[in-house]
Amino acid sequence: MATFPVVDLSLVNGEERAATLEKINDACENWGFFELVNHGMSTELLDTVEKMTKDHYKKTMEQRFKEMVAAKGLDDVQSEIHDLDWESTFFLRHLPSSNISEIPDLEEEYRKTMKEFAVELEKLAEKLLDLLCENLGLEKGYLKKVFYGSKGPNFGTKVSNYPPCPKPDLIKGLRAHSDAGGIILLFQDDKVSGLQLLKDGEWVDVPPMHHSIVINLGDQIEVITNGKYKSVMHRVIAQSDGTRMSIASFYNPGNDSFISPAPAVLEKKTEDAPTYPKFVFDDYMKLYSGLKFQAKEPRFEAMKAKESTPVATA
């Protein structure tokens, strides 16, 4: 099995730019995931985010999670659970408008830190989109422009903790799925593992690394690149000891963004290669919400069928 791709992003600014871009390209084509080091985000900021997130979980969410587990009898399950994930989460929205001030139980300093964290992640996401454009032969800013729609991108952060699980063989931390959106930036626990991706029919661990940011591609990147780059199935395995922190930020198209394979990519496709569908992002999300934990291919086929269905006129 090939080694999980780790990219030193600082090298794009020097003599190793071409080799670094090729490493990113190979990861996007063959893994759908890669891990960034020297990505330019402050390690002090990352340390603060981690400490505050873990403190917040202990103070306000751990007891609630224990009560939920007791109420559902999850300590004593005897057969595999298919409709529930062993995770404690809350969601922060940054763009097009922020909801950070509305989330209850967050200390003011934590709100401020997460706002700063989001600003830095947004910059990193847009830098990565431009590197993808360069690799794909698209004009600089193409992906950002597609994602903007009329009101800007959707950008938000899912803050998760995966507590120790008494039955990790029967309950997943997070069931297998591919992500619906654009580009996902994950700041994860560097001590407690659990994230896995599906590669060549086998589940592969995503290695926890101190101060790294794990990148994975969503379904929209697969569509825009007409399958050259892939979104891949991934999951979180619950652990019997240790609480795993996961802070995943999703830089997604705006609701009214029109998604379709990029013309410059289609020009290079072989004649027998299928063409991916065209659709409005919000329509895809409505479909995805009910089919998240299923294969992506039927979602693409459903959007293609919708695209070819004639609109009735009076």
Swiss-Prot record:
Q: What are the required cofactors?
A: Fe cation
User: Which keywords has UniProt assigned to this entry?
Assistant: Ethylene biosynthesis, Fruit ripening, Iron, Metal-binding, Oxidoreductase, Vitamin C
The cross-references to InterPro entries, in alphabetical order and at most eight, read: DIOX_N (IPR026992), IPNS-like_FE2OG_OXY (IPR044861), IPNS-like_sf (IPR027443), Oxoglu/Fe-dep_dioxygenase_dom (IPR005123), Plant_2OG-oxidoreductases (IPR050295)
* Biological process annotations from GO: ethylene biosynthetic process; fruit ripening
Leader peptide range in chain numbering? none
Annotated Fe cation binding lies at H177, D179, H234
UniProt feature coiled coil, ranges: none
This enzyme catalyses:
1-aminocyclopropane-1-carboxylate + L-ascorbate + O2 = ethene + L-dehydroascorbate + hydrogen cyanide + CO2 + 2 H2O
| Domain Fe2OG dioxygenase stretches | 153-253
Q: What EC number(s) does the entry state?
A: 1.14.17.4
Q: Which SUPFAM superfamilies match?
A: Clavaminate synthase-like
Induction of this protein: by what? By ethylene and wounding.
Pathway listed for it is:
Alkene biosynthesis; ethylene biosynthesis via S-adenosyl-L-methionine; ethylene from S-adenosyl-L-methionine: step 2/2
Q: Name one GO molecular function term.
A: 1-aminocyclopropane-1-carboxylate oxidase activity
Which proteins does it associate with, and in what oligomeric form?
A: Monomer.
Family from the record = Belongs to the iron/ascorbate-dependent oxidoreductase family.
State what protein this is by name: 1-aminocyclopropane-1-carboxylate oxidase 1
Q: Which organism is it from?
A: Malus domestica (Apple)
